[in-house]
């Protein structure tokens, strides 16, 4: 690492802008709360912004804090980071709007009949639990509801079902 790279890093960390804010952890459509996901999305996606527009908006009038001219790769990184940060803010706002309800039920079967049809889209092992978590989406086109089902860590005779969102249609029964 040369002195220019070191100065660039310290200039960013001393600035009041949070340029080094990283995107939230995310796995495609899955919603995770309590476990660490190893995939980071957002940095490889195109957000529809021109790199020069975003970099110019971020640094207009403040370029004097740099001791060297910005390279194109620096502008690209800053623009990608800024747009990823803005995208994550939108995800946080959407998450607040959705309702989340959890039920703990004693059951031999994992998927209980709740009056809706579900499509399984994922399964993963959860930290500190010997039982996998299963992910489902409502099978009606355009319905945003998701649910996850897992056995209780402490008492496997219980199933924890968590619903996120509200159905935009009536039940199937």
Curated annotation (Swiss-Prot):
Q: Name one GO biological process term.
A: defense response to fungus
- Provide any one GO MF term from the record: DNA-binding transcription factor activity
Q: Nucleotide-binding: present as a keyword of the record? A: no
- What superkingdom heads the lineage? Eukaryota
DNA-binding region per Swiss-Prot/TrEMBL record: 107-172
Q: Name one GO cellular component term.
A: nucleus
Q: Give the InterPro entries listed for this entry.
A: WRKY_dom, WRKY_dom_sf, WRKY_plant
Q: Which PROSITE patterns match?
A: WRKY
The entry's localization annotation reads: Nucleus
Any one Pfam family here would be WRKY
**Bilayer-crossing regions:** none
Q: Among its keywords, does the record have Nucleus?
A: yes
Kindly report the protein's main subcellular placement as a broad class: nucleus
The signal peptide, as residue positions, is: none
Q: Which residues form a coiled coil?
A: none
Q: Which key words tag this protein in UniProt? A: DNA-binding, Nucleus, Transcription, Transcription regulation
Tell me the protein family, please: Belongs to the WRKY group II-c family.
**Known function:** Transcription factor. Interacts specifically with the W box (5'-(T)TGAC[CT]-3'), a frequently occurring elicitor-responsive cis-acting element.
Kindly provide the name given to this protein in its UniProt entry: Probable WRKY transcription factor 50
Species name for this entry? Arabidopsis thaliana
Lineage, uppermost ranks: Eukaryota, Viridiplantae, Streptophyta, Embryophyta, Tracheophyta
Gene encoding this chain? WRKY50
């Amino acid at each position: 690492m040369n002195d220019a790279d070191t100065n660039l890093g310290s200039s960013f960390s001393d600035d009041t802008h949070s340029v080094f804010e990283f995107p939230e952890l995310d796995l495609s459509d899955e919603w995770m709360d309590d476990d660490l996901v190893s995939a980071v999305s957002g940095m490889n996606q195109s957000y529809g912004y021109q790199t020069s527009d975003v970099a110019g908006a971020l640094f207009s009038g403040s370029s004097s804090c740099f001791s060297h001219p910005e390279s194109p790769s620096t502008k690209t990184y800053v623009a990608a980071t800024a747009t990823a940060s803005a995208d994550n803010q939108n995800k946080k706002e959407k998450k607040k709007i959705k309702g989340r309800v959890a039920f703990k039920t004693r059951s031999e079967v994992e998927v209980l009949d709740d009056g809706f049809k579900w499509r399984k889209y994922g399964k993963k092992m959860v930290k500190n639990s010997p039982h996998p978590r299963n992910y489902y989406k409502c099978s009606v086109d355009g319905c945003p509801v998701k649910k996850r089902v897992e056995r209780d860590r402490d008492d496997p005779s219980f199933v924890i079902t968590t619903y996120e969102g509200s159905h935009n249609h009536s039940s199937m029964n």
